[in-house]
Amino acid sequence: MKKLLSLVLTLALALSLCVPAMAASESMTNFQKTATYNNQFSDVSASYWATPSIKLCYEYGFMKGTTPKQFSPTGALTVAEAIVMADRLHEIYTTGQSTLTNGEPWYQTYVDYAIENGIVQAGDFTSYTAKATRGQMAYLFSRALPASVLPSINNVQTLPDVTSSTKYSQEIFSLYNAGVLTGSDVFGTFKPNDNIIRAEAAAILTRVALPEQRKTVVLMKQVQWGAAKLAIPQSAGAGVTENGMYTVTSEQDACGVIATSVTDSAYKGLSVTVLTEQQMNNILTQAFNSTDGKLSNAKSTKVSFGSVKAYRTVGILTTDEGAGDCLIFTYITGNKMDMICLLAYENDTALK
């Protein structure tokens, strides 16, 4: 009997040691596919921008349809539903599974879990049934996982509609720099007070949970060039040279833009393509050689931008920064001839 009791105690001790060891630990590898998406959502077309994210969300168990055959991609989310998604991310990351069930009211279990695990604080939201905003979603999702698994891959320092005084600004910038948020335009406009839709939530969810889905971004800033507004990288510098050329340079990307415009009534009614390709080559070569740059190996071809006829010229431009491949577009509108030169010092794939 004593030997049997000893065996039972030894077995119990072994099991008590083995079970915790076999339990899932905090890890991004805990996110695993649990279902197969077979195009069952009739309101999600193959060409819809968020279809890949919706598919991944379904397969990884992050989101379900509003019905077995409907996802409602443009439907709004409530704060409670957004908390459910944040809880699901946290629980799977922490334990390897999602086990939470509805309470009374239905969302109370999820709110309690979020508070207990530091995803939200009591009093963060005045209504859990209100529609969730994009800013609130950023707040929840940035806190669902440890900051260590959301490292910065971008360097976003400014946004058009988010400042240090904007609610949730810290979480918003954190997700931009982690490659989770990209904005609604080239400037990174976020619209923090707009209601978030289910398709947008799917995109954010997949990028938080699956690092390979995160995006590197180069956000632009707007600068004025005469009557025109140009979009240039945030890290780029801009200025006007003594001879009136507008220049944009980015040391980070080893590239630049040179733009100039010449006004002459003689241009009115003309197309730049009245010039031959060789004449265009000669004009550009002489123009650059009269500045601090030198253009060589110029080769021009005729192109069109809608109704505007233009020349596309490739060549090698040498400046005090060194020699680089360049791409030049020259065209006439009204009584102005405009020239825009794109320059890459290291990697000419930027010009493709």
Name what the model sees in each region.
Residues G226-Q278, D320-G322:
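Secretory pathway targeting signatures of secreted, lumenal, and periplasmic proteins
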Residues A231-Q234, E251-A254, V308, Y331-M339:
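Short, solvent-exposed coil/turn segments at beta-strand boundaries
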Residues G61, G179:
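Phosphate/pyrophosphate-binding loop motifs in nucleotide- or prenyl diphosphate-using proteins
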Residues N282-T333:
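Signature of long, low-cysteine stretches enriched in small and polar/charged residues
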Residues G65, L77, S235-E242, F288-S304:
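Short secondary-structure junctions
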Residues V218-Q222, N243-M245, G306-I316:
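Short, hydrophobic/aromatic-rich segments at coil-to-beta transitions
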Residues S235-A238, K336-K352:
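Surface-exposed amphipathic alpha-helical segments
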Residues L4-L5, L9, L15-W49, K64-G135, ...:
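Feature responds to low-complexity, polar/acidic, surface-exposed segments characteristic
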